[in-house]
């Protein structure tokens, strides 16, 4: 289920990032300290009153070389295009500025709910000054001190109040996948080649421009698929369409709804930092992964080309050791027929459950091969393990002391589990817990 989106807009130095961090809280921290697994600070998940939402700081999307008014105009346009709720941040210290009025006139034309947050109201005496902001015509202003956390609860109440009604859970029998990657890697050509030119025309689902475009199809075995592609990746001429951070934001919305993610790389251009960043988001989200090298027909090859590419990919994407690599051509349709079966196998791995008895046999065999570590004379004891969830498969290992479970030994156990069971194309998570 795709999360509703809340966009924070406003001119520089009004405290957008501080409010963003206050709402996002600890959710914004980096999950894994591995090169390529990064958390872009323009995008996070917020939660209030049991409602989750995606939070975007549009200020992080700005082209710093663009004229000032152009920057904030782009912010407002992106927010109107992407968001279900807009939080317009102004400064109580400076009062209403020309830039605030400029943005408010743009936002006034949208049907998207706008919450006016007057930030930097750091003491009670300043609350009287917020009434000047009624002149912006955006309703009641909310006094906030992001630094001290004052008033953020009221803003969050207003956000949740204006979020769209929660969608029903999607059919788990349908495999949902998305194609992500830099502009011009050939995502649209791949989509057309996979579906056939006559089928892609019928793909758009009625809705706003910020909705994902879903394409439904069924393979020869009767398996239903939904291919998820964001509107911004398919339509040309959108504001900031080709800027990296805007593409990141679009890609993450597609990742949210996908079970399997196809990371598309352009064989003509090789691997870029953007590729690693996007792949890192999908990995952190626990999605199934396929690395698709497109335009394979365009490069000169010898007997060592595939091996060199695979080695480079494994080196650049060290956190994706589980992801299969496939070399394709949207133009010639080379190997495209293999993708549906590969996606199916990865989806099955994502949903695989291992009986506890069988799992613990593997754990005991692993300990016999490589005994548990010791620290200051105390040895790690593993009592038992059990699988607690799927998508991705997640296992809890109950131990005497969590601190004794070194990262390297947890990785060893993961490798042993992977060797015993087929978990193709999916991350698996192992968590150490002290037995009570």
From Swiss-Prot:
Residues 4-167, 175-351 form the EngA-type G domain. GTP 2 binds at residues 181-188, 229-233, 294-297. One of its GO terms (biological process) is ribosome biogenesis. One of its GO terms (molecular function) is GTP binding. Coiled coil: none annotated. Residues 352-436 form the KH-like domain. Disulfide bonds: none annotated. It holds the Pfam family KH_dom-like. GTP 1 binds at residues 10-17, 57-61, 119-122. Keywords: GTP-binding, Nucleotide-binding, Repeat, Ribosome biogenesis. PANTHER family: GTPASE DER (PTHR43834:SF6). Belongs to the TRAFAC class TrmE-Era-EngA-EngB-Septin-like GTPase superfamily. EngA (Der) GTPase family. Associates with the 50S ribosomal subunit. GTPase that plays an essential role in the late steps of ribosome biogenesis. This is GTPase Der. It comes from Streptococcus pyogenes serotype M5 (strain Manfredo). The gene is der.
